[in-house]
Amino acid sequence: MGCFNFIKVMMILFNMLIFLCGAALLAVGIWVSVDGPSFVKIFGPMSSSAMQFVNVGYFLIAAGAVLFALGFLGCYGAQTESKCALMTFFFILLLIFIAEVAAAVVALVYTTLAENFLTAVVVPNIKKEYGSQKDFTQVWNSTMAGLKCCGFTNYTDFEGSPYVRKNGTFPPYCCYDSVNNSFMEPCNNFTAHNMSVQGCFKQLLYDIRTNAVTVGGVAAGIGGLELAAMIVSMYLYCNLE
């Protein structure tokens, strides 16, 4: 088998994997959209944290659809030796790569701006839905229990919420004593203020920074695969008659 044919086979196998990953993400996205609480129970607090900031179901459906189409395009281009399909595959992957780099730069440089924007979106929802909307409340409870945090910024996010109006106290997670691994009761305004439990957004950022090597390694690996796929597709394109 010549070098060209070997690379062609590798291109097909690689894109079959992308195709299958896209199909899996589509399936999970549909599942999350239909039954979010079950998703949280299985995948734990990090998944519930993500659900506070983006609509995970729609995000996974969109990402799955892109990967599904990209995998099909790569397989088709390599198998049929279509220069048009290979060039389209290359440019789509290039756009995705540029978007990922831009998103990473924005996330690093404008973390405070992102926090302010998310605060304006998430906090009003907490005040409106927590304690009255079952799925929303369950997702937040899973987040706070898993990350040992309280609200998006702190306990004041729950002021005026259906939960506080009904119970006269804040969620117990806002009065968590990390030293004794217990909840202080009753979790009223005075206790919650004195406990000063970290907000979930800052706690999530802390966890990400703590695992920066792992996060960076995964990001570098994905970027490397994308660059390799672009190089291979361009190699095939240039060697086709």
From Swiss-Prot:
InterPro entries: Tetraspanin/Peripherin, Tetraspanin_animals, Tetraspanin_CS, Tetraspanin_EC2_sf. CDD domains: uroplakin_I_like_LEL. GO terms for biological process: protein stabilization. It is found in: Lysosome membrane. It is a multi-pass membrane protein. PANTHER family: TETRASPANIN (PTHR19282), TETRASPANIN-1 (PTHR19282:SF216). This is Tetraspanin-1. The lineage of its organism: Eukaryota, Metazoa, Chordata, Craniata, Vertebrata.
